[in-house]
Amino acid sequence: MIFAANFKMNHTRASTKAYLDALNQKLASKRSEDRVFVFPPSTALDHYDGDFTIGAQNAYLEKNGAFTGEIGLDQLDEFAIKTILIGHSERRDILGEDQAFVAEKFSYFKSQGFEIIYCIGEALEVREAGEEAVMVHLLSQFEGIDLSYEKMIVAYEPIWAIGTGHSATTEAIASTHAALKQHFDRPLLYGGSVKPANIKEITAIESVDGVLVGSASLEVESFTQMIFA
């Protein structure tokens, strides 16, 4: 099972270090087959010791250059970061990354050998239009994406469930994941208001290979409760 914590724009460099020190101690008894990822803000990227993988929430598709406010391959290489989130709905919807740019970013980091957690998801109005509309929308988010890339993990996050406290039903998760898995053979995570109270029922779904957790991962106790549930 895969457990990924996306801190988004939360935690400082100091609090991230304290979090990861505590996490490392708690992971001493984790199941060997489980994988743990943590995506801190870019200001907290560093070398950390532990049975977890540190990834970047975002980076620009260049080694370096005149891209104000961005980080590139040089900054990631400094800390041996080889894992990245791409396609998160907040980057698409708030920061204006269209599918063409997302696909370009995917291709660049694929060419650099990165492990990529690639995010897809639908808005509430799409979900309300029915399962067929949902699948048409989700599959459109794979345009330009190499589904055979061996270092890709897919994360399905219904936008209407992110940060709202309202997760999709287990039936909806199972149905959507099963439909998606007809199109690729990569690990598939669920994200969207995942928390200790619902982690067992979500990870019990056959087509769920793990979870991408936002707000419920910000406290190390909460995140480790999910890992050891």
UniProtKB/Swiss-Prot annotation:
Pathway terms, separated by semicolons: Carbohydrate biosynthesis; gluconeogenesis; Carbohydrate degradation; glycolysis; D-glyceraldehyde 3-phosphate from glycerone phosphate: step 1/1
InterPro entries according to UniProt: Aldolase_TIM, TIM_sf, TrioseP_Isoase_bac/euk, Triosephosphate_isomerase, Triosephosphate_isomerase_AS
Pfam families: TIM
EC number(s) from the headed UniProt entry: 5.3.1.1
Keywords noted in UniProt: Cytoplasm, Gluconeogenesis, Glycolysis, Isomerase
Residues that, per the record, bind substrate: N6, F7, K8, G163, S193
PROSITE patterns, per database record: TIM_1, TIM_2
Reactions it catalyzes: D-glyceraldehyde 3-phosphate = dihydroxyacetone phosphate
Catalytic residues (positions): H88 (electrophile), E157 (proton acceptor)
Gene3D superfamilies on file: Aldolase class I
Function text: Involved in the gluconeogenesis. Catalyzes stereospecifically the conversion of dihydroxyacetone phosphate (DHAP) to D-glyceraldehyde-3-phosphate (G3P).
UniProt similarity note: Belongs to the triosephosphate isomerase family.
Quaternary organization: Homodimer.
Protein name, as recorded: Triosephosphate isomerase
Gene that specifies this protein: tpiA
